Amino acid sequence: MHYRTGYHADQLGTPPSVLETGPWRLHYQAWSRNAHDTRPPVLMLGGAFQSFRSFAAEVEELLEHHPVILLDLPGQGGNLQLAPELGLGALADLIADFAEALALPPLMPIGLSYGSALAALFASRHPQRCARLLLAGVTTFGRPGARALLEESLRLLEEERLAEFAQGSLTGLINPLRLERTGISPGFRKAMLRQLQRLTGAERERYRQNSRRLLDFAGFTHYPSCPTLVLAGEFDHFTQPWEHAAFAAACTQADCALIHDGDHLAQFERRDACAQLYRPFFLDQALPAAPIGATRLARSRLNEVERRQEPRLAPAQRAGRLHHAELGSLAVEVQELGFFGARLQGALPAGLPVRGWQLALEGLPMLDLLPLRQAGDALSLVFTHMDAAASTALAEHVRPAQLAAAA
């Protein structure tokens, strides 16, 4: 491997090197302080809406001690080649092909969000090629609510309802209830919303293919055996802390840490807290016992992490109505209400349609929702947050009661 030297953040926007393996083109940039570095490289694999430039600060930080490779597989990042026939496992195998073609030593992947599934599969399927593994925003998509929302996002794209798709996706990535803790600015949210609203036809197709891979993924048959570090944002409601902890518990040699005041974007919101953990991890040094801005979870307690991301409380006004274009209006009692979902009770017909539902509550706009589980006269649901005004109103409605309950 011949590494580029003289790194500067602006160079992440320059054309990548391209490796062809069979019909597939793999885009990469390889950086080091030494052009002929033989040390194990850190391999960066990003999420759905990230590019090489998203990792400018991390590359600068890591280059002090490691060579760094940024890799875009087909359909990822800036690689526009579509690969609908490749599942997650086949994409992960391309990482092994990449390492073999360039005669790389065992890699140290960093997998973020969508990239976490690829990195973890690479580590589990090719253990001899993986020295260490760092994951954040672990996407296994076994949780019914997450799957329902992802399916709905695909339907919205198919129907060209980009504004609603963008609003729902933004609410998944950024926790609106915790903005004062995560520090996400209105300007950042607006910029991300515009990016989502303006996806080109090719970008939408890539999103569709990547999302379908996640939904089609049957789960891990075996887990990484190399030293593994899993970082979870404490307010991540998209890929929740208990899911990170459960994944870490299934790995042979995993540590799991909760990043304070972070959500699904914790690795960008709380760079210092994350760095103080991954720096020693990649150097095979002991992790700090009491890291600043993070909490390490005891391995014996990984399967005991709280599964509910927010308190669901009984509203002061419990009477509500479910509306559906075909079934009309149905009276319900709201037993639990949160920002992300609710639990209702009422005389509901069996086999409810998947789409087209709204909940009417006194003092709130109509709330779009997806039914999740129906058991007798009880219904659990998730809110889709496709309407910004309704989402904001619901957040303002539930926040005081949730803060009081947590006090």
Residue ranges with predicted function:
Residues W24-G78:
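Conserved HGGG/HGGXW glycine-rich cap/lid loop of the alpha/beta-hydrolase fold
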Residues G262-A275:
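Catalytic histidine-centered segment of alpha/beta-hydrolase-like enzymes
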Residues P144-A146, E164-H222:
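Conserved alpha/beta-hydrolase catalytic His-Asp/Glu region
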Residues I69-I110:
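Active-site loop/oxyanion-hole signature of alpha/beta-hydrolase fold enzymes
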Residues P224, V230-A232:
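Short beta-strand/loop motif that positions the catalytic acidic residue
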Residues S124, A131-E160:
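Flexible "cap/lid" loop of the alpha/beta hydrolase fold
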Residues L313, Q317-G351, G356-Q358, A375-S380:
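Short strand-loop-strand
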Residues A273, L277-R279, L283-L337, A395-A407:
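N-terminal helix initiation/capping motif
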